[in-house]
Amino acid sequence: MAPLGSSTVFLLALTIIASTRALTPTHYLTKHDVERLKASLDRPFTNLESAFYSIVGLSSLGAQVPDAKKACTYIRSNLDPSNVDSLFYAAQASQALSGCEISISNETKDLLLAAVSEDSSVTQIYHAVAALSGFGLPLASQEALSALTARLSKEETVLATVQALQTASHLSQQADLRSIVEEIEDLVARLDELGGVYLQFEEGLETTALFVAATYKLMDHVGTEPSIKEDQVIQLMNAIFSKKNFESLSEAFSVASVAAVLSHNRYHVPVVVVPEGSASDTHEQAILRLQVTNVLSQPLTQATVKLEHAKSVASRATVLQKTSFTPVGDVFELNFMNVKFSSGYYDFLVKVEGDNRYIANTVELRVKISTEVGITNVDLSTVDKDQSIAPKTTRVTYPAKAKGTFIADSHQNFALFFQLVDVNTGAELTPHQTFVRLHNQKTGQEVVFVAEPDSKNVYKFELDTSERKIEFDSASGTYTLYLIIGDATLKNPILWNVADVVIKFPEEEAPSTVLSQNLFTPKQEIQHLFREPEKRPPTVVSNTFTALILSPLLLLFALWIRIGANVSNFTFTPSTIIFHLGHAAMLGLMYVYWTQLNMFQTLKYLAILGSVTFLAGNRMLAQQAVKRTAH
């Protein structure tokens, strides 16, 4: 352990806690997530639609497909000039590729213009308008807007409204787009909030992401701030980026699109503040490093980062305020070596400025500042109970073990005194865990006591054998005394073998056998006492009762033998066979009811069997009556 007066050592553990001022992003795209998203988009083309998702999605992330010329050739060869959807995918994908131009005939142009009609679906209108825009062809925006508005009144789904927003972003700014812009507020009202952290449509992640991307693209186009609150933007962001693996290309494309617009738009840019590992664990410096990025983990190097204040969690006292972070490469650093922080937890309120578009730019970090504990003024004493002899005191220095042994018996007590200090500052410490453990060297018995500080923060442990005999089970012997010190803010928890103490209890109180009190020994098996079975009647009684139950059956057989059973009239007609089988089945059902079924199940089966048996019996008796009449 470092001696007193050595250089300061700080160990910081950083956690982002919920700020009372605003929501903070809980989900965003880390650099690893961005690469995984790119990998999800970079797939072989299976059709023109997949090529669109892959090319435009990668372009949103600032990447390109591996072979742009090959991709352009694929688009040209798979384009169907008579299909509006095919033209849309080709136009948008070719725009994302440099030097990829696609020529369009007049017939194709007329096809696209004809699709911009209220007789077409919203999807068809969107694809036609976007294709015309992508190919650089002229379009009557006001007429397209009228067709879109008329069709939207018939399709009131969330996806149709989102596609209307996407369509409007391709129309001229001179057109009156207010009716479409007003749909944004209606869509926001239809969002579902989950736990105050997430906001999404019940249609799922893809629709939610397309809505956010379309909203900001349209608002950038018309030059109006979207009617979405900053907290709602963060909730939408948390919902969209909470998913890291994507089932389809379209889903990955939607996430890439929203990541692009939230990173670069004219109104709202969410800020992500992430601590970079832990602070420097050295004797020379204590530095808090923060990564300040957008949702794509791209550094906001032009930002300014300030510490508003740092408060102790325990006392709420402000220990540091109004301090700027220093930009170093892609991170921001705060060196607070010169500030006298005592060990404990602190809340650092950090604010990111430099752009009025920043949202979620105030974050609160919980910082744990650890230190090293030192043990000083350690005195071991034996004190005579009658005080006729002066106490014998031995001072010991950590981590050495005291020489010799100390005795505690009916005539003298044993006492331990010590103080705990901060090695770095010399201030007194009161850790959460300060224990004295006594371990019997022969039996393995362990007894643990809590050492408490007095008003002067001097820890004292006194062993009086007359008062502590219950804890020790009056087991005399040589005990090893350990001092245990621990705390979440201590860098060097201590387990110190301080001394050997001989403890003597009066012999008449000592147990004949000493059971180990080791906490880790197997416990004695618990013997359960179950209720004794009830007495049963004698075998004679049970046999007699069984015979009485069977007596009617025996009587039936006896009468049949005496009178004679008339089986000559038995006929093998279906009704006769079904009747007797049904009767036998009902008797069998009674047995099953007794062993397995409940009353309601039995009644259900009995209704079926009874109906069949009744009908068969009625038919059988009718046949017998006809037979008698004939004779």
Swiss-Prot record:
Residues 1-22 form the signal peptide. Pathway: Protein modification; protein glycosylation. The gene is RPN2. It is a multi-pass membrane protein. It is found in: Endoplasmic reticulum; Endoplasmic reticulum membrane. Residues 23-540, 598-604 are lumenal. This is Dolichyl-diphosphooligosaccharide--protein glycosyltransferase subunit 2. One of its GO terms (biological process) is protein N-linked glycosylation. It comes from Pongo abelii (Sumatran orangutan).
